Amino acid sequence: MCIRDRQGPFPGDPVAALPPVHGTFLDAARRDPGRCRVGYFTRPPLAHVEIHPDVALAMTATLAAIEDLGHEVVEVSPPFNDSLLPMFTALWSSLALLTPIDEEDEGRLQPLTQYLREQGRAISGNELATAVSMLRINSRAAMTATAHLDAVLVPTLAQLPALVGQLRDDDDPAADFAAQVAYSPYCAGYNISGQPAINVPMNWNSDGLPVGVQLVGRMHDEETIISLAAQLEATHDWRHRIPAMW
C-alpha cells in the first residue's frame, strides 16, 4: 500500500518509483516472475567490515532457495567500495545542516547530530558538489555492471539486529557514526543509486531472530523483486513467525 501511494515523482524529485508497467504492484506480488538471473555478493563493500556468521548463513540459505525455485544465481563483485565512504560522509554531514537550528539550541541535539553538523560546516561547496557528482557517476557504473541481472541478492545488515541503543555512543559520536556504517554497509550505495530493494527475512538464527537479506532490482523495476520476494515467501512462509523476545 505504501509503495502504491508513493509511486510517481513529486515535483523536483531526482528519482522516483514509477508506476508499474504490468498492472499494479499487488499484481506483481501475485505473478510468477519467470526464470530470473540473480547476482549476489556477500563480501561487504567496505574492506574493514566483517559480517556475522548468521548473516553469511542467511545468504547461503536464500541462494539455495532461489536455485530450488529454478532461478540462476551468479556471483558478482560488489559494485561499491571504500572510495565512496568519504563522499557519502560529506553528503550525510551536509544533510544534517539542512534544518536551521538556533545556536543556543545546538546543545539540545543528539551528540551524533551535533558531530555531523560540525563536520558539515567544514565541507566547502566545491567539495560537496564533487562528492555528489562522484556518487552519481559511481551509481551509473554500478547499475551498468549489474544490468545483465534481474536482481542482486545482498545482506541487509552486516550484523544481527541490534539492541536499542547498542550502537549509540554519546561520548564519542565519531565512533557512533563508524559503528553505524559498519552495521549497515550494504544499503547506502543503493540508497544513493535509487534502485529499488526489498528485505526478506528468509533465515532465523538459533536465538529466534530474523536475519534479513535484500533483493535489489534494476532501476524502476520494483515489479521483478516484488514477484521474487512473494515467491520466496510462498515457499518459506515467515508471516506468522515472531521472535520470542517480542
Where are these regions (language model features)?
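Short helix-loop capping/hinge segments that flank enzyme active sites or metal/cofactor-binding pockets
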Residues: 27-42, 91-145, 155-159, 199-209
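Active-site pocket-shaping loop/turn-to-helix segments
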Residues: 46-59, 63, 126-132
